[in-house]
């Protein structure tokens, strides 16, 4: 995955011919006032809860911080249940480790993982632990503009400890914010950021700034698009995440992405939508080894 954008699709769309000729001003005004916002490029400007497409990033962070290993097991009793609080999940084997947790998209596994990280005394405080968690995500391209060569890119949103100190009355703890572990709560990402995470995993530890223009005549390849960006995660921790995403396609939550003769790796996502039906998402890359393409659909 080289960062080259092969397709960037947003819907609803409009006929670009409307923006040429003598009526272009009137046509643009009509498009701008359209309630469906056809001029709004949702692929880079909209920010949505990433849902379970966020879980691979959590698997990487929890390994990097020594909270889990490939064999660490957490229980799931149709969800994460603690002190009267519940985050639901579906039926599958329990307990389970990281690989099947990704394959089955287990909510409880990642809730337990984040809770154990935030409550770990090595960080000194929950605020410090949360900011370590957040900084890993920033290094992966979340919570900031990736730098695509198009205007008006959104940075999405990642909260930090200061945000919670200011917005949660009476204080906060791991249980208060546990939904961020599964890509909900305050977490927002653009579809491009989700695709970029997938490219990072496909490359096992690096990504390039997403771009439409590869080279300019007389200038050559643009350096900022040819420079590897390396997050804070050791490359050895990608192995289990890739295996879990491959398992999701073979016999997990995204079997429809299985293509005969091509080893596809993928991750589905569902996120609550306060405005209507739940959001659905998918990210994937192929082939598993020597990958050529990464995709995200929201």
Task: Walk through the language-model features, giving the residues of each.
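Beta-lactam-recognizing serine transpeptidase/beta-lactamase-like catalytic domain environment
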Residues: 1-53, 57-298
């Amino acid at each position: 995955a080289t960062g080259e954008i092969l397709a960037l699709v947003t819907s609803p769309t409009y006929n670009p011919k409307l923006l040429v000729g003598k009526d272009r001003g009137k046509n643009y005004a009509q498009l701008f006032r359209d309630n469906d916002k056809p001029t709004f490029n949702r692929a880079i400007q909209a920010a949505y809860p990433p849902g379970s497409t966020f879980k691979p990033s959590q698997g990487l962070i929890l390994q990097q911080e020594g909270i889990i290993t490939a064999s660490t097991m957490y229980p799931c009793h149709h969800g994460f249940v603690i002190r009267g609080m519940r985050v639901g999940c579906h039926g599958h084997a329990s307990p389970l480790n990281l690989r099947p947790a990704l394959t089955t998209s287990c909510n409880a596994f990642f809730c337990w993982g984040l809770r154990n990280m935030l409550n770990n005394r090595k960080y000194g405080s929950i605020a410090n632990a949360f900011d370590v968690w957040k900084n890993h995500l920033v290094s992966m391209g979340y919570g900031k503009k990736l730098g695509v060569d198009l205007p008006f890119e959104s940075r999405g949103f990642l909260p930090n400890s200061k945000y919670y100190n200011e917005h949660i009355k009476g204080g906060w703890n791991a249980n208060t914010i546990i939904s961020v572990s599964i890509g909900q709560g305050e977490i927002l990402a653009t579809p491009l950021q989700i695709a970029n995470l997938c490219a990072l995993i496909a490359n096992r530890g690096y990504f390039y700034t997403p771009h439409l223009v590869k080279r300019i005549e007389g200038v050559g390849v643009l350096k900022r698009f040819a420079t590897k960006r390396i997050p804070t995660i050791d490359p050895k921790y990608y192995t289990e995440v890739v295996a879990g995403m491959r398992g999701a396609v073979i016999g997990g939550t995204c079997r429809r992405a299985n293509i005969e003769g091509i080893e596809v790796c993928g991750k589905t996502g569902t996120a609550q939508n306060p405005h209507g039906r739940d959001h659905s998402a998918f990210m994937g890359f192929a082939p598993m080894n020597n990958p050529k393409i990464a995709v995200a659909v929201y």
